[in-house]
């Protein structure tokens, strides 16, 4: 009886692991078909179908005409994290203030397993309407916020990031060389801010600064995005520097 229970426990853990692998693949590639998931994870279609059907039935995936997508159920978890993290209300207020002042798109981003995730965003009067939200991930090396975060890492940590994630090109302007990335991050450290010149989306520019907590640990990046002719060459740097000082002071006082 003992050995049977242990075997079942191991099988159950393996099943949970597979379910999360499927969820992560759908999240990163949605919408996806059953065949795409089966081929990507090297599992039979019948097995994948059972997993997908179960995840749909419990509300964590949605099945639409164009394929499977993650559901908004995950936003409830994100909201719980927001409530738990004391610095988030101050951060959200600062994002809103910056959007009003700059009249551009303002975003607060953070690093999640080597990818950039968008926590808060606010669109100013002239700002671009942005699709990225808490379900969207970007490579750190292709964004201003990501490079701002990377600039605070050691060389060994940056090399480990590249080993795990690579330096894939998102556009023809994306950095794809480790040497070039190191040079870029040195400039970010020297000037205190990072830029994105059409490295994620053609025609889009951005500038961002890293944000640290009371222990001087970087918790994310505050950035402004817009058309390359308005943002991307250091515009709004002073505005962001002032916002950084105020936000980090508020976080330290919590």
Regions found by a protein language model. Name each.
Residues 202, 220-254:
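Juxtadomain coupling helices with adjacent low-complexity linkers
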Residues 205-209:
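Short hydrophobic beta-strand micro-motif common in sensory/regulatory domains
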Residues 72-165:
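Amphipathic alpha-helical effector-binding/dimerization core
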